[in-house]
Amino acid sequence: MSRQMWLDTSALLEAISEYVVRCNGDTFSGLTTGDFNALSNMFTQLSVSSAGYVSDPRVPLQTMSNMFVSFITSTDRCGYMLRKTWFNSDTKPTVSDDFITTYIRPRLQVPMSDTVRQLNNLSLQPSAKPKLYERQNAIMKGLDIPYSEPIEPCKLFRSVAGQTGNIPMMGILATPPAAQQQPFFVAERRRILFGIRSNAAIPAGAYQFVVPAWASVLSVTGAYVYFTNSFFGTTIAGVTATATAADAATTFTVPTDANNLPVQTDSRLSFSLGGGNINLELGVAKTGFCVAIEGEFTILANRSQAYYTLNSITQTPTSIDDFDVSDFLTTFLSQLRACGQYEIFSDAMDQLTNSLITNYMDPPALPAGLAFTSPWFRFSERARTILALQNVDLNIRKLIVRHLWVITSLIAVFGRYYRPN
């Protein structure tokens, strides 16, 4: 079955999941005869046995999840899904598998619009503001690139040897500096702060700030840039935030933009932080200063030329956020741990990933130097490892990441009701 058919089918499963849990998250009281009939019709579209669903609609869904996990953990059964042709194919796989023949039809005979229309006419008990539960939105990620959502810069900060953590810096910055010109670069919600603390005046002139690895993967849209003396609500000691209208302008440049960008204005700026250093031209002498960049931050691949080169991801290794895909896998991971299958499934996913990468190589073989150090559900860290394979064509690396991304989102959807016997 082609990639698009998988996505369409999983979208239908999302609809069923919402249908049966909308009453109260985990309970099913309030389902009427009409609701059960509509639910039965939806199961029929997937060729799912309806046995047991009247007492608990999760029963057939649990059977489907168990079959899917069995399917995905055997690479000789899900091998078609791991081939390059899977993305563009529109045919039923040549491999025979009970999960596909029993539970998934190669064509959806009822359009998704009709399915959604059924959901809009529920007679379920009260939900003043019906909503799709967050954990059921996983398939939406499978339809998009994994770089499209805003991200908090403080989620990306990672401590390394010789570097103080982000939160511990709060206490340090609140302590008066013991020397002149102590540079810093920190992050909080919606803001990145950088500057120099000092116990004496700092003359006007040029100053350079090295962008750390965790920030080099970011771009910002619609940002205000201004002087401040606050970090997580704590006053930063050794900086001056005051200014007058007569002060000479302070500007800065970033590696991806040669224009002088203004500080302390109403201008809304958009730029990326990848590629090197921030060069700041301080217009007036200050006893220390702190510049805040406040806006909507996204991973560089989203809104910059770096999307086409991904150079920001293949720079200095940095553990970036996993685009929250692990949130959608919480239920499945909990069941794996509860039944003692966590390590077994992890090994199966490692084998699946290696088989997928091998299929993209010519001749088929694992690239030299490939080694994963993160668990399979930490998607961004695995993506970084794949994108760092300099001996593999960049377009191939990007396709592998997209391919693995869709499979991970399918696991989040189909594994939700996994309950091994």
UniProtKB/Swiss-Prot annotation:
Q: What is the lineage of its organism?
A: Viruses, Riboviria, Orthornavirae, Duplornaviricota, Resentoviricetes
Mind telling me what this protein is named? Outer capsid protein P8
Function recorded in the entry: Capsid protein which self-assembles to form the outer icosahedral capsid with a T=13 symmetry, about 70 nm in diameter and consisting of 780 molecules capsid proteins.
Has UniProt tagged this entry with the keyword rRNA processing? Answer: no
Q: Which domain of life is it from?
A: Viruses
Query: Its Gene Ontology molecular function terms?
Result: host cell surface receptor binding; structural molecule activity
Is the keyword Flavoprotein assigned to this protein?
A: no
The cysteines covalently paired via disulfide bonds are none
Q: Which family does it belong to?
A: Belongs to the phytoreovirus outer capsid protein P8 family.
Q: Which SUPFAM superfamilies match?
A: A virus capsid protein alpha-helical domain (SSF48345), Viral protein domain (SSF49818)
Q: Which key words tag this protein in UniProt?
A: Capsid protein, Host cytoplasm, Host-virus interaction, Outer capsid protein, Virion
Q: Which GO terms describe its biological process?
A: fusion of virus membrane with host plasma membrane; symbiont entry into host cell
Cite a GO CC annotation.
Answer: host cell cytoplasm
Q: Name one Pfam family in it.
A: Phytoreo_P8
- What InterPro entries does the entry give? Capsid_hemagglutn, Phytoreo_P8, Virus_capsid_a-hlx_vir
Quaternary state and partners of this protein? Homotrimer. Homomultimer. Interacts with host peroxisomal glycolate oxidase (GOX). This interaction mediates its relocation to virus factories peripheral to host peroxisomes.
